[in-house]
Amino acid sequence: MTTFPIDLSAYKPISLDPSNPTLTDDQRSALKANIQLCRDAIIFFTATGAARGVGGHTGGPYDTVPEVVILDALFRSQPSQFVPIFFDEAGHRVGTQYLMSALEGSLPAEQLMHYREANSKLPGHPELGLTPGVKFSSGRLGHMWPYVNGVALANPGKTVFCLGSDGSQQEGNDAEAARLAVAQHINVKLIIDDNDVTIAGNPSKYLPGYDVAKTLTGHGLKVLVGDGEDIDSLYRNICEAINTPGPIAIINKRPMCPGIEGLEGSNHGHDVISVPLALKYLEAKGHSAAVEYLNSIKKPSNDYKFLGSGDKWGSNRNVFGEAVVSLLGKMSEEERKAKVLVVDSDLE
């Protein structure tokens, strides 16, 4: 098996004490090194999915690396104080779970190079019992916070974290979970990646008036807002959340895919990074072996012919979208505005 071309042994397993909200220079340096290492690894192994034509998601796991490596250091320092699981209500950010499984030794790093490949046991959402090291199952947005409330109730005296997103917080399940967490004073901490990006575009444009902080404050949660790329501010907010009993939401403002040329701030970062952009990123970071491996991947071909089917293939959501566009294209702009109402489920 080909060796994973980015040296994950360079990860620095530091410990952080939540009673001290100020990072030392050494701690800050180690965290920043871990963040860069993990982000580079996520770019590489998710891009193998793009190279094979099986898709995937890069931006979500890439974006949330800073909070994940901080939590990892906290879990290592005070394991009895936490439920040491990176619960994530955005199932498509599964790259986080796979990478952390590899770092803890549950999953061979080389297996990451088969991300979303058939029979690799690395599907597009985490599946408990399928992938070594994965500790929960998670589907589409909005279904994990209620589950995490239950985990917290089952572990009194411990702090439970749930990685969230501004997209997830639009879902009704999360509204119910927020009200229950406040009513029962559940010790759950939400760390929300607020990048103003979903697959449909920018919520600030297509859902004006929606605000994550105001929404959660309205449910009764204490809310801390900060810059997700400012490691000192992020760590202070996480420490404050830990040291304050009850439900708290930390909202991290950041653009989608910070630092990735061609993707930063774009909703295209939600999906898997394209091979050309991944190659450009990895070359700039000096990962020549990763570049060589990506260039060597051959997209599988299917030579079978199916009766009644053409040569064009597409996902259900794309086929549906193209069908709608073909119908609307026969109408004038005035007619479309007068007769057509679009109700978007955010899964087109």
Description of each model-found segment:
Residues 77-79, 83, 126-287:
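Glycine-rich ThDP/TPP pyrophosphate-binding loop and its adjacent helix/strand module
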Residues 1-161, 287-348:
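Thiamine diphosphate
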